[in-house]
């Protein structure tokens, strides 16, 4: 049994089973960079404040920089017995530079150290996730620009409702992913403050310059209460909440991709590079990527629920339960990034079958509202017009024809308000073009929306 950094008050070593059980080095080694950055800033401040000698601070910093380089080069092996990344690095440091290494932890606890590391980690990952989201939005805007005139059916209840365009449909997702971006930014804004100096729970007797450390590490300020500084994991939960919404949006889009690429819809064809085949059925081309993203949505929701449940009812301040925050947080980060990285090129390369979309927009009485609107514009009340057109649809269903296939006499028989111009007014192109209201599907409104989204992006 190995000697622990905290072993002073113990008469016996840790049982081997316990050692394996409570060690987190297997997963928290991913925080090595943040841990070393934090330690360097802490050591520099200790030296500047005269808490340790300036030369000692220098030795520590130099030692930490070498450890960083060695970890990066794959030359460091971590030790399960040293528990976590924080103690592994401190242990290596002391092995290398001698007793002066033991001064690094002055005025610090692993509790504020780990709170710092996770914040630094998440800050970088939020930047990367935001970049991936903006890349997706850029591709959506490019594809929308191509398809401003590509008419397709819009649905409610997955029943054909009214004609829209593919561009308009894609722009709905631009809105969702735009909100996701702002949620990430907002979340980072709230947690970008340094907990170092909170100590184990009650701060420290050493005259630390918390603000200087925070500034060196790129924080906007410091946490205002030492208990909260070490026991707050709201930011991890907020991130998982934001990540869950990203996944929810991706899964809705994926569901449509899966439907649209079915033979029954045939609205799109995924590129071969983003589809897979069947081991038995030679004809198959499956939208596995979209399905897998839809499936992975569940794990990110699971990560969110796991974190909420870990934190539920924990008394202040730090409790070892909180070591369980990392694997779920890392999983959410990896999953959302992995999904975005494959979803974006899948959308960029998918082939759109405009003729199939337009054909789809034509069946199913998608212009029925336009017939009613036509009557309302000719002075019939909308409620009455709705009733008249409902009867016309019933008549069409019985005859198996579309509204535009009715003769002018048929129209007149239903309402005297119909004139010859009704046929032009209910063409599917007109149905789209006349919905010029801001936020609507008319090509000019969509072009304006693309322009506005581009401006927001830059
Ligand atoms: N590995 C620990 C964690 O991730 C670090 C903090 C440990 N603190 C303690 N008092 N045992 O939560």
From Swiss-Prot:
Family, per entry: Belongs to the lyase 1 family. Argininosuccinate lyase subfamily.
Regions that span the bilayer: none
Keywords: Amino-acid biosynthesis, Arginine biosynthesis, Cytoplasm, Lyase
Localisation: Cytoplasm
Enzyme Commission number: 4.3.2.1
Name of the featured protein: Argininosuccinate lyase
Coiled coil: none
InterPro entries from the UniProt entry: Arg_succ_lyase_C, Argininosuccinate_lyase, Fumarase/histidase_N, Fumarate_lyase_CS, Fumarate_lyase_fam, Fumarate_lyase_N, L-Aspartase-like
Record organism: Heliobacterium mobile (Heliobacillus mobilis)
